[in-house]
């Protein structure tokens, strides 16, 4: 039969500060499962309604394990539990016992007919605060239309992505990016990372600033875990979506799943074309000789991309599940560029020339993931997980750069570049969890990771008759890293207090080989990574946690490879094969406050890092070459506040603020690079819900200026806006978004010393996107996006 779900106004975390008591106050708890498959139902809606007015008094949604916990202050009430595609259950005549009502396990039955009318479905909060992490729910971010995963990260609290695609967490770039809790070929931290993952594919992003020993120790700043959508509703469900935008950003996406008693089959496919322009400007000045080189120009990254995910869950029985997932992505790149040079001597223009570049590349990526999970009879939290993951990324790139003189001395030059890059990674994991008792649990596991990378780089100069290999810029660089890890954690909870101790041991075997110089480097080392976390629940509205962990950030191939990037012959970047890993000791104290319409998370943190990797620029007349070195230590102390406030049913605000002070110590070639500085950033998002299912969202972001090892980065602010309109009775969604409304998001750096002056500026500009999506079966409309900034 057809069911019309009553319009819900769901207020998340309806809890009080607990400093006062009320005779009608009680806690409502329970667990929700599918009556047929006996699997948990996450994100089901639990509503407490006033018996007299029939209006919603309080509400929440079930978590990933189908559980819910809700504080209620009402005497005459009834409870409704609902989920799309299932019959709503109603509970009346409930009486609290010792200020608590336990509904135990609630089994929802599937509807025999498809829901045709859904007025309002309970929505997850945009940001959820937990003691050990923050969860950013992408579906609630209206401005995500037209975004890629990289742009989604830039909207996540504590995270910043600059216009070069570099991801930082609380100002530190040592970030480990995972997908569904695992490393992925789609999430490496190169400039092309996350390009084929789109906002439509993402359920949420978890920000973990102080991970336990269970997590890979990689990433001194912490962990960003991107959770992809994986539909598990019974029957056939799906969504299709279309996006278009300017600059060129066009994509189509399809998501399908079919769930039976034994199998859950799922697939996602996306394809599109996007154009990513960037304007650049540079000034290199030698104060001693009074010579100056000015350059300005543009570069485009035009991409055709495809991404296909196929997977299945096989429920062998109630306690054993086998999951197999495959992912294939392919990108075709075209990167035209042009730079205009002007060479001055004592303010007199002497030479002018242009450098035109044309780069073409293909990037195949594939990955497989096999998992087996066993739940033991005595407790469903008693589990064994075995997984094997393989991934491959390749890049075949050809470039040609042509210098054309327009004034002065002859600077004509014709160069070709050919790159063949291949990376293969293999990860094997075993994780065991045993809740020995209600208060005591243990975790143990191991992991073995192999990274095998090769980069064949060749530069050829035109001699007039033919192109001849330039040995100064040509090399074949090989990099192999093997990491074997073991970990164990134990946790104890009593009343309102909890303690978790952990230790991780990692043995690293890394080797590099530079073919053209026959230079080999190798290193084997073992590290211990302890972690300590403790928490105390002062009352239902206020909890605190403190934590300590030790982390590592190992140099990547592009950090180690000494090849020169010659796209701009006067601003060159190169790697250093002698780099050592960074080590960080991280301390943090966090409080989470939850009131009637306010949630607040505040943290004080301190980090100590040694062997800091820093890029140092070396000036030679008007040419700048920047290379990475290990420069001493860094101490960082900061405060971070994240909050959400919903003063009215139609108005909500989310904000975050991060400020820290840092102290750097280090020397290079007898030059002191020690300095101190401050940096802060803030973000505020306001969402307004209008009648007729129309939502509006505006986000303002500001990043302050700050000191670098050799100069100063300028501060900047930018704004994004978005509109969303539900149509076709909620099955369709129309989105419009404008990112960087005022074209003010820039990267601007100044290095000013006694002998040299360098200025660099780059900008992407405004992006506008329009998206439409439609859900069928029991699915909902989604907003597939194909863009990346």
List each model region and its residues.
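Outer-membrane beta-barrel translocator/receptor signature
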Residues: 217-224, 232-281, 303-306
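Short acidic/polar hinge/loop motifs at secondary-structure boundaries
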Residues: 71, 149, 155, 182-209
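Short, acidic Ser/Thr/Gly-rich low-complexity loop/linker segments typical of extracellular
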Residues: 51-67
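Surface-exposed extracellular loop regions of Gram-negative outer-membrane beta-barrel proteins
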Residues: 222, 226-238, 279, 283, 509-511, 540-586, 606-626, 706, ...
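N-terminal periplasmic accessory domains that precede
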Residues: 100-107, 149-152, 192-193, 207, ...
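Outer membrane beta-barrel strand-and-loop segments of large Gram-negative receptors
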Residues: 296, 416, 425-429, 470-475, ...
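Short, acidic, small-residue-rich periplasmic hinge/interaction motif at the N-terminus
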Residues: 33-37, 45-49, 82-86, 100-142, ...
């Amino acid at each position: 039969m057809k069911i019309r779900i009553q319009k819900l106004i769901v207020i998340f975390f309806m809890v009080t500060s607990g400093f006062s008591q009320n005779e009608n106050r009680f806690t409502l708890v329970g667990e929700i499962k599918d009556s047929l498959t006996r699997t948990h139902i996450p994100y089901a809606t639990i509503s407490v309604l006033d018996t007299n007015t029939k209006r919603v008094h309080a509400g929440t949604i079930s978590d990933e394990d189908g559980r819910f916990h809700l504080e209620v202050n009402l005497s005459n009430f009834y409870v409704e539990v609902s989920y799309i595609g299932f019959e709503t259950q109603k509970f009346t005549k409930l009486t609290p016992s010792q200020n608590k009502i336990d509904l135990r396990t609630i089994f929802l039955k599937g509807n025999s007919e498809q829901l045709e009318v859904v007025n309002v479905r309970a929505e997850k909060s945009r940001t959820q605060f937990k003691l050990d992490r923050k969860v950013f729910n992408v579906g609630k971010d209206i401005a995500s239309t037209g975004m890629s995963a990289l742009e989604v990260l830039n909207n996540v609290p504590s995270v910043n992505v600059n216009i070069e695609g570099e991801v930082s967490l609380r100002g530190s770039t040592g970030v480990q990016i995972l997908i569904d809790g695992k490393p992925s070929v789609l999430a490496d931290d190169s400039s092309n990372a996350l390009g084929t993952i789109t906002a439509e594919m993402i359920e949420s992003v978890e920000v973990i600033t102080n991970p336990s020993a269970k997590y890979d120790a990689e990433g001194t700043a912490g962990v960003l875990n991107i959770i992809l959508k994986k539909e598990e509703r019974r029957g056939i469900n799906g969504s299709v979506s279309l996006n278009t935008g300017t600059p060129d950003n066009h994509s189509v996406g399809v998501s399908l799943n079919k769930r039976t008693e034994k199998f859950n089959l799922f697939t996602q496919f996306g394809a599109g074309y996007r154009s990513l322009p960037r304007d650049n400007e540079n000034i290199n000045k030698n104060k001693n000789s009074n010579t100056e080189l000015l350059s300005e120009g543009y570069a485009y990254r035009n991409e055709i991309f495809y991404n296909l995910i196929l997977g299945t869950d096989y429920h062998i029985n109630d306690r054993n599940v086998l999951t197999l997932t495959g992912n294939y992505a392919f990108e075709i790149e075209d990167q035209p560029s042009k730079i205009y040079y002007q060479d001055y001597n004592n303010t007199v223009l002497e030479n002018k020339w242009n450098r035109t570049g044309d780069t073409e590349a293909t990037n195949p990526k594939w990955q497989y993931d096999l998992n087996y999970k066993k739940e033991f009879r005595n407790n469903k939290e008693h589990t064994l997980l075995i997984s094997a993951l393989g991934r491959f990324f390749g890049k075949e790139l050809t470039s040609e750069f042509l210098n054309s003189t327009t004034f002065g001395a002859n600077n004509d030059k014709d160069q070709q570049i050919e790159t063949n890059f291949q990376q293969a990674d293999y990860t094997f994991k075993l994780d065991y969890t045993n809740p020995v008792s209600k208060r005591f649990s243990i975790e143990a596991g191991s992991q073995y990771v192999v990274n095998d990378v090769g980069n064949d780089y060749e530069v050829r100069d035109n001699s007039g008759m033919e192109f001849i290999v330039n040995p100064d810029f040509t090399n074949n660089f090989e990099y192999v890293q093997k990491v074997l890890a073991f970990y164990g954690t134990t946790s104890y909870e009593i009343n309102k207090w909890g303690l978790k101790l952990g230790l991780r041991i990692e043995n690293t075997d890394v080797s590099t080989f530079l073919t053209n110089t026959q230079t080999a480097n190798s290193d084997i080392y073992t590290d211990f990574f302890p972690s300590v976390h403790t928490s105390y629940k002062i009352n239902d509205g206020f909890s605190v946690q403190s934590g300590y962990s030790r982390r590592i950030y190992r140099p990547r191939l592009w950090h180690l490879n000494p090849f020169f990037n010659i796209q701009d012959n006067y601003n060159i970047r190169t790697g250093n094969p002698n780099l050592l890993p960074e080590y960080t000791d991280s301390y943090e104290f966090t409080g989470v406050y939850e009131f009637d319409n306010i949630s607040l998370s505040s943290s004080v943190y301190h980090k100590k890092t040694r062997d800091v990797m820093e890029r140092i620029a070396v000036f030679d007349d008007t040419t700048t070459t920047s290379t990475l070195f290990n420069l001493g230590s860094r101490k960082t102390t900061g405060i971070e506040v994240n909050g959400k406030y919903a003063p009215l049913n139609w108005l909500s605000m989310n904000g975050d603020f991060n400020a820290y002070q840092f102290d750097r110590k280090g020397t290079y070639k007898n030059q002191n690079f020690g300095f101190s500085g401050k940096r802060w950033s803030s973000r505020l998002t306001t969402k307004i819900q209008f009648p007729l299912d129309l939502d509006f969202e505006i986000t303002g972001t500001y990043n302050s200026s700050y000191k670098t090892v050799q100069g100063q980065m300028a501060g900047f602010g930018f704004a994004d806006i978005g509109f969303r309109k539900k149509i076709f009775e909620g099955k369709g969604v129309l989105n419009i978004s404008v990112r960087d409304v005022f074209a003010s998001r820039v990267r601007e750096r100044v290095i000013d010393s006694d002998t040299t002056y360098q200025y660099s500026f780059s900008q992407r500009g405004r992006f506008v996107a329009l998206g439409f999506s439609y859900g069928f079966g029991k699915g909902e409309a989604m907003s597939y996006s194909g863009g990346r900034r």
